[in-house]
């Protein structure tokens, strides 16, 4: 196998169109699961934020959309009412701010009142590639989307 370059591993996903061909190829795979949570493309790793909130189970996982290589991590969001049938809700958290410019890494979730909060490790790297981790937070909106809180 060939080694992925840093540029390949940390490529930013700008639109769903960029992975549409890869998505179609993955959907046709004879190895595609019919029961378990799995990524729409690429690599999934650490499950995060596994929580029951208002009758719906929420499960996010770290996701690298391009292939089986660790790099720029997103959180992909899935939901279920029965833990058997899962719905893909799309990207939950994108690495798109100063605090997580090189990935949205492991975290958790907690229900407080009627709100569901998600906490994750923002992976920041500077121009010298020095890593600084930040504890970041998001809240589940009424539209079912995760909304980042402004500052860690």
Q: What residue ranges belong to the model's regions?
A:
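Beta-rich carbohydrate-recognition and catalytic domains
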Residues: 1-152
């Amino acid at each position: 196998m060939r080694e992925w370059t840093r540029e390949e591993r940390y490529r930013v996903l700008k639109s769903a169109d960029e992975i549409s061909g890869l998505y179609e190829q993955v959907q046709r795979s004879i190895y595609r699961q019919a029961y378990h949570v799995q990524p729409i493309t690429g690599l999934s790793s650490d499950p995060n934020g596994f929580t029951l909130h208002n009758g719906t189970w929420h499960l996010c996982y770290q996701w690298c959309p391009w292939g089986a290589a660790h790099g720029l991590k997103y959180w992909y969001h899935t939901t279920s009412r029965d833990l058997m049938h899962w719905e893909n809700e799309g990207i939950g958290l994108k690495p798109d701010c100063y605090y997580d410019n090189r990935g949205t890494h492991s975290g958790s979730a907690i229900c407080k009142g009627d709100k569901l909060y998600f906490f994750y490790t923002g992976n920041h790297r500077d121009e010298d590639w020095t890593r600084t981790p930040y504890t970041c937070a998001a809240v589940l909106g009424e539209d079912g989307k995760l909304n980042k809180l402004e500052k860690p």
